[in-house]
């Protein structure tokens, strides 16, 4: 038998004979992996101060991105020297191109808003954060994967098929001061009328027992985030995505206030922005960017993020705050809930956050 000394020498010789590349791999395995620093989300007591999100900066954020596809649309017609589209392109192909272009722009706006909200959340925290974090994505999350494409695609197709007129170029509207004045009017009328239809059906889902099954999935989330904005049963998705916009469009038409394609497109972007912001749970005081927001605040019927957040935390029959754009109908029908964190005592009037000043990461991050 070889001695212990000989065995040790052989072991040392065998180690020395290992190629340097293998040694490096072994050394790399022993090294502790580098971990990225985790940014802690601030947890704020419910009685601590809360900042305001500037209203004009939200209009700037939405309008600039809403006008982007309209501008590209107009430039395309100028480059191709097309005065009347029907003479050059088949109407079906033309509408298909419009759907693709505006659909991509819709998705771009929502993703940028989502990134801005995520950035704000890391700095300011979330509502009810001292009690419970935001709910995580459930295991059965397949609906979340196609909820955004479904919303974007359905509303864009609806808008193009119902209101798009190929014979009218965007410049025919954008160059008119009257059109801009009416746009400001529609940015008040459209969300208020839409909110009436949503309030009625939403309240019925809660108070009529046989209708609750169409709304149950959306309420499995008690502390929502932007991912759960369109997380719902198929019946609710159909009503939210195309039902209320169509009812509002034809109501305005019946009132002799018809909307052109570009006005409706911009109004839809405003509605989608408010829907996402309302499910964000951000610990910030802000109202939906409605052109008459100052008037709603004067009468105490403005909506804030906490209103819908409290609605999700309440039970099946105990829920209140059914509105999603304003508090007009909740106030009229006595279904308002008291605010906890965004009460006037906590609001910091001197501390404002601007949407355009948020350092939004690139879409690839």
Swiss-Prot record:
Residues 189-335 form the Fatty acid hydroxylase domain. The keyword Oxidoreductase applies. Pathway: Secondary metabolite biosynthesis. It holds the Pfam family FA_hydroxylase. Keywords: Glycoprotein, Membrane, Oxidoreductase, Transmembrane, Transmembrane helix, Virulence. It is found in: Membrane. InterPro entries: Fatty_acid_hydroxylase, Sterol_Desaturase_Related. Its EC number is 1.-.-.-. It is a multi-pass membrane protein. Residues 20-41 are annotated as: Disordered. Glycans are attached at residue 47. GO terms for cellular component: membrane. One of its GO terms (biological process) is lipid biosynthetic process. Disruption phenotype: Leads to complete loss of verlamelin production. GO terms for molecular function: iron ion binding; oxidoreductase activity. The chain crosses the membrane at residues 62-82, 89-109, 144-164, 179-199. Belongs to the sterol desaturase family. TMEM195 subfamily. Fatty acid hydroxylase; part of the gene cluster that mediates the biosynthesis of verlamelin, a lipopeptide that exhibits antifungal activity against plant pathogenic fungi. Verlamelin is a cyclic hexadepsipeptide and is bridged by ester bonding between a 5-hydroxytetradecanoic acid moiety and a carboxyl group on the terminal Val of amide-bonded tetradecanoyl-hexapeptide D-allo-Thr-D-Ala-L-Pro-L-Gln-D-Tyr-L-Val. VlmA and vlmB are altogether regarded as essential components in the biosynthesis of 5-hydroxytetradecanoic acid. This is Fatty acid hydroxylase vlmA. It comes from Lecanicillium sp. The gene is vlmA.
């Amino acid at each position: 038998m070889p001695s212990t000394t000989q065995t040790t020498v052989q072991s040392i010789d065998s180690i020395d004979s290992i190629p340097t590349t293998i040694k490096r791999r072994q050394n790399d395995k022993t090294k502790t992996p580098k971990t990225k620093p985790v940014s802690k989300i601030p947890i704020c007591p419910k009685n601590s101060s809360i900042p305001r999100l500037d209203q004009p900066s939200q209009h700037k954020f939405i309008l600039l991105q809403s006008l982007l596809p309209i501008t590209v649309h107009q430039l395309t017609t100028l480059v191709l020297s097309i005065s009347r589209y029907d003479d050059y392109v088949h109407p079906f192909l033309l509408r298909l191109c419009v759907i693709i272009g505006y659909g991509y722009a819709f998705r771009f706006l929502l993703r940028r808003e989502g990134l801005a909200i995520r950035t704000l959340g890391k700095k300011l925290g979330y509502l009810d954060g001292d009690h419970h974090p935001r709910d995580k994505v459930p295991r059965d999350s397949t609906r979340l994967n196609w909820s955004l494409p479904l919303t974007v695609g359905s509303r864009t197709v609806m808008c193009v098929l119902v209101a798009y007129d190929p014979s009218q170029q965007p410049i025919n509207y954008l160059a008119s001061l009257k059109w801009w004045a009416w746009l400001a009017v529609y940015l008040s009328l459209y969300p208020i009328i839409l909110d009436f239809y949503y309030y009625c059906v939403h309240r019925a889902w809660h108070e009529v027992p046989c209708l609750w099954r169409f709304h149950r999935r959306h309420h499995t989330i008690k502390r929502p985030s932007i991912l759960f904005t369109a997380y719902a049963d198929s019946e609710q998705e159909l009503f939210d995505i195309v039902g209320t916009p169509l009812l509002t469009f034809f109501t305005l038409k019946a009132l002799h206030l018809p909307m052109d394609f570009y006005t409706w497109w911009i109004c839809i972007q405003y509605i989608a922005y408010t829907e996402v912001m309302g499910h964000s749970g951000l610990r910030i005081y802000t109202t939906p960017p409605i052109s008459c927001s100052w008037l709603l605040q004067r009468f105490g019927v403005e909506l804030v993020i906490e209103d819908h957040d409290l609605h999700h935390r309440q039970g099946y029959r105990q829920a209140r705050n059914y509105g999603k754009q304003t508090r007009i109908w909740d106030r009229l029908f006595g279904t308002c809930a008291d605010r906890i964190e965004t009460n006037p005592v906590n609001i910091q009037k001197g501390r404002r956050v601007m949407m355009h000043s948020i350092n939004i990461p690139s879409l690839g991050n």
